[in-house]
C-alpha cells in the first residue's frame, strides 16, 4: 500500500502511538472544517462512525459505497451512535471488552431506547430484565472504557497538512513501473 501511495505522489503518514483510524479521523475533521467533501476508502467498520454529510466511505472489499442502510443493518443505529453500540457489544478483534452477554442487536435496542451509553448507564437500575440490569450495573466501567477505546481521536497532532493530499502531478514513469511490478 505504501508503494502505491508514493507511486501516485501522495504523502504517507504514520505517527507513533496513534492508529491509522485516528489519523484518518483527524484529517476528515480538518477537511470538513474547510467545507470540502471526503471519501474514505476502507473496509474497516470502525471508520463507519465518521459517516455523515460530506463524508462517504467506499468499501473496496465489497466494491461499493457504504450507505446509511448498510450502517443500520450492521449496527442498528445512526453513525453517531455506533460507538455506543460498540462500547456495549465489544469487539474481540480490537481488544474492546464491552459488556458480557450483550451483542450488537441488544446494544442497538438499548441505545435506540436510551439515546446514548451514558443515559443508559444512569438508568440501568430501571431496566426490567434482571440479568441485563445486573450485568450493566456490574460492568459499567467496562462499558465506559470500551467507549473510550472505540472512539476515534480527531485531534492527532499531525505534521503533514491535509493540503498535501490534494492530487499533484503524477510521475508517469514511476507510476508505470509500480503498476508493471505489481
PLM regions: where:
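Extended two-metal-dependent nuclease catalytic cores across DNA- and RNA-processing enzymes
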Residues: 1-159
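Short, contiguous strand/loop micro-motifs
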Residues: 162-163
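Long, highly charged low-complexity segments
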Residues: 173-182
